[in-house]
Amino acid sequence: DDDLDARVLEHIDAFFAGLPAAGPDHEAATRGPWWFFLSEKVVAITQGRSYFVWDIKVGRPARVLSRYVTRTPAGIGLGSPFTMQLAIQEAGLPRVLYASAGGAIGKVIGRKGLFYELVGNQINAIDGPTEYSAYPSNVSAKLAPKDPDAVAARLSAAIRERVPEPWRSTFGGTVIMDANDIGRNVLGSDVPGDWTRFEEMFADNPLGQGSQQTPMAMVFLREDTAQA
């Protein structure tokens, strides 16, 4: 967690230190309200909730259940024995079996996502290894970050202590985002109210899904357009 805070503040400091030299266009673009966005994957890694696949002891239930999961080009989901094993460890085998039965019924009646509704525990945020991901994500599987709301609040407090005015006053808070090329979901934030607007801001997945290695973003609301 300390390493995460230090990395975040390093980038925040560098951004505002370089802003005066960036010119009037950049100064104008940063006058409005702004938020700090952070990939949930980075939070999970710093919490020790990411595991190399060779360290995950896969049981028979995980091997069997993972065969029935629909895979998409945007991510492996629970369609891997490794990610399914993490789901079982996180939620418990009885609950995963219960949710699997419900999910099967959901497919019959045309209701998508019933498995994740029933299993809970942010199992939908579990990620597995993909070829297009940068190391170590190409050889690891991870759980959702723990206590993401608390992490967001802690980072926001640290940012407010470091950011100069007037940006300190216009800072809205931190958003921990789970995004890929087919969807996005706010896992945690210290910003009150509806988080739908933040998911809409990330409709085109600006942090990327592959080798971009851009897990952080500062999003400013343009005063002249009222758009992020």
Model-predicted segments: where are they?
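N-terminal and secondary-structure boundary signal
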Residues: 1-228
